[in-house]
């Protein structure tokens, strides 16, 4: 069995980054991946402006007198255009263009307005005080977004602020999804003896949609090798990646491995993790392939740990980060046999001492999916580790946005 780290390294080294691109209006580019470095065409701000409501002043005037007349007003979008006489200030609002010659802006709370309309300043401001300088946020020619960045509710408004109307992106990844097994029934149909609902395909589709993939649903395939091969050949014609659920363990009716050897190549099909040992990765003639285990928890764990980064690579999402890991104290004993990296469902929180404390949630069988609902992390127990006693330190992996 291949350790998870080696499996992930092998997979990411083999998977290509996209080369095709398309150009979209920014209002249609949410959750897409930026396909080029984006350079600012302007300075932001494009002019010196006031950071406060107050008075624009020249320090030379204040050095002669701390009381000045008011020459006029400047508003955002309506700059002061009058004559700025000596020994006067300009009333200015936040965002308004700084009048030519101003050295500082004094906030209105530090100014006394006199009965005759003049204003008295309580202290001499510093040079440049409360002035936002041209290019202070973004300079003309700055790279504001790197290739491989996710376009979202933070990055797209930045492009809008620069007047950038369109952006080059990578195409959405096309992913074919299918389940295998005579025992599977679509959700909504009554169950007969020995049947179960096909939750894995539903789960995978939800995860793919959250990753902004274009999902091609090939449904449920019976345990029939000829139909399975036909579906594989059709799926690879339409998709960049084919994902199956079930059919990768060592069973008489598990055809995935055999078909993959026939129409493509298997790179690995067993990894040293629990749950999720029977995970397959390979290459069809025209598409890549990931085979998830049939047990629901195993399918979700392997998707999270392996398929998620694979999709990031194929999508061009080079800024994707692996899930964060933290140290925590376990509040209960944990059962663990050495030999495989173990991902147990857990719930973590801060205890009264301000420490991160974690406990397992529910039974940890690979077929027991309900424990995920009350979990917010994986408890990651090292491959060589055995049973864990309450009070010991363990590694946890808080769920990222994919599972929240």
Write out the residue ranges for each language-model feature.
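Short, hydrophobic/aliphatic alpha-helical segments
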Residues: 30-43, 79-91, 281-282
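Helix-rich terminal scaffold detector
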Residues: 4-5, 165-292, 296-302
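Short, glycine/charged-enriched hinge/interface segments at domain edges or termini
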Residues: 2, 15, 23, 55-217, ...
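Short, low-complexity N-terminal leaders and the immediately following helix N-cap/first helix
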Residues: 1-64, 68, 312, 317-345
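Solvent-exposed alpha-helices and their adjacent loops that cap or buttress functional pockets
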Residues: 48-50, 61-63, 81-85, 98-100, ...
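Flexible glycine/proline-rich
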Residues: 22-27, 77, 138, 261-404
